[in-house]
Amino acid sequence: MAVKVLVVDDSGFFRRRVSEILSADPSIQVVGTATNGKEAIDQALALKPDVITMDYEMPMMDGITAVRHIMQRCPTPVLMFSSLTHEGARVTLDALDAGAVDFLPKNFEDISRNPEKVKQLLCEKVHSISRSNRRFSAYSAPAPAAAPTPAPIPAAAPSSFGSHSAPARPAPAPAPTRAPAASASSPAPKRKNYKLVAIGTSTGGPVALQRVLTQLPASFPAPIVLIQHMPAAFTKAFAERLDKLCRISVKEAEDGDILRPGLALLAPGGKQMMIDGRGAVKILPGDERLNYKPCVDITFGSAAKSYSDKVLAVVLTGMGADGREGARLLKQGGSTVWAQDEASCVIYGMPMAIVKADLADAVYSLDDIGKHIVEACV
């Protein structure tokens, strides 16, 4: 059965091109289009698409507000289009917080110059997030302010980026949650003297990382490295966001940074992050031969070489199998590898690769991973 898609964008050119690209895939059917957030809600209710592609800046109602309403009234996987700017990153992260599943940079130049590459990426994303559809029937999100028909508002509601007057290290704010999934069956972990916690993730990762990291105390005794598939323009904003929400410190990694307890370093987009035996971070240019920049396998592999059996590696929600080969090296050295369970993943790809390769020492639900990291390390 074809994946039914609703395309939402106020640009006539972009609506047409996205519709044409998707319609060229025989397994995708564009069932409708909308020019603003209010139309998107009406069309989502009427057409019941499997996936919605959504722009942010639109008249009458912006994309984030529309996502919030859609998640409340007819939960549907949403793929956001975003500009490759710091502000675009902030807006995209707000949209993911509101319930969107994934995002793609909105790059008109790429559409003109690399249509086949754009088609492959867009169709792959649509197919991937459509498979998360079954998880959306249980979505629980805060009720929108307006009902029953959303009223146009000029700007999105304040995001969890907060104002500059917010406390430097507030109590962690809960991430938007779907209804709790059944807990995985692995027993609680035993405490070990880990020298490093390494977490890799992709689709669904921004919200998942927020959920995990906000459970860690400021006194967390181990350094943390984070590898999230994300464009170069986005990782700094994401690190800043996590730093405001968490009790630990979070920053985008820079070449020469030194690992220390209570600090999480986020691999910069478009580059690779490695760890040496002295606990120093090396940031390398992204290798065009690798699909992912940053790549979980690269960081996990360097950690395996530098820390032997003293790494706790966690693979969270995401497409593909990045992290599997790095996890294999970690296991060969005696380190511990956990995977997120299928029920709580947005996309059960990366964790599934770990489980199928028999590399997982434990499988936990997302809501349990943070507390189990604390139990294992503190």
From Swiss-Prot:
- Domain CheB-type methylesterase, first and last residues per copy: 187-378
Residue numbers bearing the 4-aspartylphosphate modification:
D55
Query: Catalytic residues?
Result: S202, H229, D322
Q: Which GO terms describe its molecular function?
A: phosphorelay response regulator activity; protein-glutamate methylesterase activity; protein-glutamine glutaminase activity
Q: Which CDD domains match?
A: CheB_Rec, REC_CheB-like
Q: Which GO terms describe its biological process?
A: chemotaxis
- Sequence ranges of Low complexity compositional bias: 156-168, 178-188
Leading EC class: hydrolase
Q: List where Pro residues composition bias occurs.
A: 145-155
State its location(s): Cytoplasm
Ranges in coiled-coil conformation: none
Q: Which InterPro entries match?
A: CheB-like, CheB_C, CheY-like_superfamily, Sig_transdc_resp-reg_Me-estase, Sig_transdc_resp-reg_receiver
Q: How is it modified after translation?
A: Phosphorylated by CheA. Phosphorylation of the N-terminal regulatory domain activates the methylesterase activity.
**Domain called Response regulatory: residue spans:** 4-121
Region annotated Disordered sits at 141-188
| Catalytic activity field | [protein]-L-glutamate 5-O-methyl ester + H2O = L-glutamyl-[protein] + methanol + H(+); L-glutaminyl-[protein] + H2O = L-glutamyl-[protein] + NH4(+)
Keyword annotations of the record: Chemotaxis, Cytoplasm, Hydrolase, Phosphoprotein
Q: Which NCBIfam families match?
A: PRK00742.1
Task performed by this protein: Involved in chemotaxis. Part of a chemotaxis signal transduction system that modulates chemotaxis in response to various stimuli. Catalyzes the demethylation of specific methylglutamate residues introduced into the chemoreceptors (methyl-accepting chemotaxis proteins or MCP) by CheR. Also mediates the irreversible deamidation of specific glutamine residues to glutamic acid.
Name the family the entry cites: Belongs to the CheB family.
Annotated protein name in UniProt: Protein-glutamate methylesterase/protein-glutamine glutaminase 2
Which species does this protein come from?
A: Pseudomonas fluorescens (strain Pf0-1)
